[in-house]
């Protein structure tokens, strides 16, 4: 809690090497069911930008979008708990303003079914904003009231879960993950829709020149050598999806051209075998006799 004039704000503090870099106020205050934050706090939408004296340091508290740039050049933003559950989370604007990492400080309680929904929500938000989304929730012992906290900690990269905490642990946990910021930047450059959405988005940027990782870098994340080939049950689903996409594409072409025959070069390899299976399935779905499939063997290949 940070007092500003006669108001009280629910804030996150960004601190690096003993220096308070800035404060970010919570935007969306839940006031339903077991939540009653509006009894105490004021939304960031209802304040004006102001300098705040706290812990012996003066920092700027903005009423708009605030980003932080590290000494390594990474841009990150912060939102708090309920913010990500809103229809238009602050992280949308943070990402469009340039944030590559989003940090969420949360006190979201546990309810039946809420955990799986939360994971889906964070994955979608990370993918939609093309960010690394780092979520840290309250854990065991952080409440004496009528709620339970599970100690959820997640690190997502463009929708993919990289690291997570042990749920309901009675011990303190540190969740560590490595995100590929260059990859996120590349994905954004390739996505014209993301660039088009950035028009008119501005933000205050607080710059810290101290390097975040002065020591030598050590790669600890797992890099899949076969990123396009899943393992386990998902492999069957992926192959079935590919097969049906091919069938749908061929069916559309045959229907459009009113073709009654297809001609295949059969070499005996995997490619021509798959092509033959796709043709057979397509003809069956279109109720066309398989006699219209003409295979030409090519033993020289």
Predicted segments, located by residue:
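Enzyme catalytic cores with a strong preference for nitrogen-chemistry domains
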Residues: 1-265, 277, 281-290
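ATP-dependent adenylate-handling ligase core
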Residues: 288-290, 298-301
């Amino acid at each position: 809690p940070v007092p500003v004039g006669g108001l009280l704000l629910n804030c996150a503090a960004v601190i690096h090497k003993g220096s308070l870099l800035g404060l970010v106020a919570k935007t969306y205050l839940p006031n339903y069911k077991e939540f009653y934050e509006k009894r105490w706090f004021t939304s960031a939408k209802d304040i004006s930008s102001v300098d705040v004296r706290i812990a012996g340091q003066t920092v700027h508290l903005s009423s708009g979008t605030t980003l932080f740039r590290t000494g390594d050049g990474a841009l990150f933003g912060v939102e708090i708990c309920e913010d990500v559950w809103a229809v238009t989370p602050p992280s949308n604007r943070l990402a469009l303003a340039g944030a590559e990492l989003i940090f969420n400080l949360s006190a979201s309680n546990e309810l039946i079914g809420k955990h799986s929904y939360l994971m889906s929500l964070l994955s979608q938000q990370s993918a939609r904003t093309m960010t690394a989304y780092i979520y840290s929730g309250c854990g065991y012992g952080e409440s004496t009231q009528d709620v339970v906290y599970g100690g959820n900690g997640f690190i997502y990269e463009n929708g993919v879960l990289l690291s997570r905490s042990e749920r309901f642990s009675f011990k303190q946990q540190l969740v560590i993950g490595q995100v590929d910021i260059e990859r996120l930047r590349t994905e954004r450059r390739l996505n014209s829709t993301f660039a088009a959405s950035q028009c008119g988005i501005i933000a205050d940027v607080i710059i810290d020149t101290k390097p975040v990782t002065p020591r030598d870098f050590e790669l600890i994340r797992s890099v899949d050598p076969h990123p396009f080939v899943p393992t386990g049950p998902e492999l069957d689903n992926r192959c079935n999806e590919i097969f049906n996409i091919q069938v749908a594409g061929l069916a559309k072409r045959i229907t459009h051209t009113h073709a009654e025959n297809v001609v295949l070069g059969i070499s005996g390899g995997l490619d021509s075998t798959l092509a033959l299976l796709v043709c057979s399935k397509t003809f069956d779905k279109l109720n066309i006799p398989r006699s219209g499939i003409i295979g030409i063997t090519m033993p020289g290949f």
